[in-house]
């Protein structure tokens, strides 16, 4: 049974993706644009965003820093515009392999600020507008690293566990108000973040394949979207 409204076509859907300059976020933006959605992309790297817009007619770019509340508020207002938004997808992420034997508090807090608190800043601005609008969908891109403690995931894993927990709580509060909520828990995907890993990454996926899994899950009305199944079911 679908926990969110299903979707038959992306054509005309207004989607704002935060963290879309590379990796999964960029691949999702590309797939959504190809499917006919009206796409707005945001990240810190303005040049990468401008490159996306140049290659995808009709797309918009809004540079922001998710660790800066004013930056988020300005970009959110611009993304909302006069027509509102149908989808808000939080893909922003920071990752460095960490072990407790080399504890690094500043970078631990950087993980928290980007991966979790950044999502809160976006929600703080947009939830009142989405509730007033009476429809819309919030999707948080988490990770299977949030399922349980894993090696070298001392900083990253807990922030993703928090993001998944946040999505679950949001669903209970927002579903009765007519809003959709989903959480995406990818396994290993070939991105600039995972490129630093010096260990074997089982069932490694390409970003374009991950994006297709996400679009299909959103269309089906899934709450949790996890992939690849041969890996995530084991987790």
Predicted features, each with a name:
Residues 56-70:
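Rossmann-fold cofactor-recognition segment
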Residues 21-22:
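Conserved glycine-rich cofactor-binding loop
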Residues 37-51:
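Conserved glycine-rich Rossmann-like NAD(P)H-binding loop of the short-chain dehydrogenase/reductase
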Residues 123, 159:
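Active-site helix of classical SDR
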Residues 183, 199-234:
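C-terminal helical subdomain
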Residues 143:
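Residue(s) in the substrate-gating loop at a strand-loop-helix junction
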Residues 99-112:
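Substrate-binding pocket helix/loop in short-chain dehydrogenase/reductase
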């Amino acid at each position: 049974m679908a926990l969110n409204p299903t979707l038959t076509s992306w054509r005309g859907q207004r989607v704002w993706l935060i963290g879309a300059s590379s990796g999964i976020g960029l691949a999702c933006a590309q797939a959504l644009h190809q499917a006919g959605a009206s796409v707005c992309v945001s990240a810190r790297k303005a040049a990468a965003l401008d490159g996306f817009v140049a290659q995808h007619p009709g797309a918009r770019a809004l540079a922001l820093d998710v660790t800066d509340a004013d930056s988020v508020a300005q970009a959110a207002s611009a993304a909302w515009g006069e027509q509102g938004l149908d989808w808000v997808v939080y893909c922003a992420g920071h990752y460095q392999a960490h072990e407790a034997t080399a504890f690094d508090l500043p970078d631990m807090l950087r993980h928290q600020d980007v991966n979790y608190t950044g999502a809160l800043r976006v929600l703080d601005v947009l939830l009142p507008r989405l509730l007033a609008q009476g429809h819309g969908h919030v999707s948080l891109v988490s990770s299977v690293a949030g399922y349980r403690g894993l090696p070298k995931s001392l900083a990253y894993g807990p922030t993703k566990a928090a993001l998944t927990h946040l999505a679950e709580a949001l669903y209970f509060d927002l579903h009765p108000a007519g809003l959709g909520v989903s959480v995406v828990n990818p396994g290993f995907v070939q991105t600039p973040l995972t490129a630093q890993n010096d260990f074997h990454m089982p069932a490694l996926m390409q970003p374009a394949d991950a994006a297709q899994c996400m679009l299909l899950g959103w269309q089906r009305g899934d709450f949790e979207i996890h992939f690849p199944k041969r890996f995530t079911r084991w987790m």
